Amino acid sequence: MEGSKSEAVFDSMNLNPQIFINEAINSVEDYVDQAFDFYARDASKSLKIKGSDKQKSQALSNGIARVRGLLLSVIDNRLKLWESYSLRFCFAVPDGFVLPKSEESSSVHQDGLYDLELDAELDSLRDKLNVVGKRSVELDSELQALERSSVSRERSLRLVNEALELYDESSMDEIFKEMTKMASELRASVERLKTRRMKASESAKVKRLKNHGKEFSAMTFDGKLEDLEKFQAELRKM
């Protein structure tokens, strides 16, 4: 934006977008430093690392420094994109914008008058910058969520493929043979059970017939007609 029309316009209004951007970036870096200072204190407390244990303390510091470096690398890339976007779109002067004449400008500064319309535009510009900043945070959160979801899907797919490899064609043949064998054994068991039941039924009938024969022998001598009819009915049931 250096040497451009936009720079001249902002200079005429005693504004410097680059200073605003630098202050925003410095604020982000300050927040990161404070966050990692708190993280270092809390980690030492949670891990019960005392100041006298220099080896563990140094290992913790090295680990935190590495994580901080990775995080700052990502944040720096994001802030560079945000800075480029802001300078290109948010601080771009619209086509047709005309600077006031020097005499008019000096008279305005001398009289201490302010252009209300320009103040409204500046307020609108600040609001847009806030919206862009919030949207940038939301996009970062969405990107992290997508990355976590992608890792989870890849892991699930890998587990499914490993499970499918266990059930190849040879395994299915073995399972089918085992099921056929079990079905044959079950059929043979059912047939043996039916045979035992038939033998038991026939044995019971023979036993009943013998018992009725004895009763009939006794009836032939002193039995009544009703007893004979009852015996005949029992034989018919058999």
Curated annotation (Swiss-Prot):
InterPro entries: Centromere_Mis12. It is found in: Chromosome, Centromere, Kinetochore. Residues 117-149 form a coiled coil. GO terms for cellular component: chromosome, centromeric region; MIS12/MIND type complex; nucleus. Disruption phenotype: Embryonic lethality when homozygous. The keyword Coiled coil applies. Keywords: Cell cycle, Cell division, Centromere, Chromosome, Coiled coil, Kinetochore, Meiosis, Mitosis. One of its GO terms (biological process) is meiotic cell cycle. Belongs to the mis12 family. Constitutive component of kinetochores that is essential for proper cell division during mitotic cell cycle. May play a role in the modulation of centromere during meiosis. This is Protein MIS12 homolog.
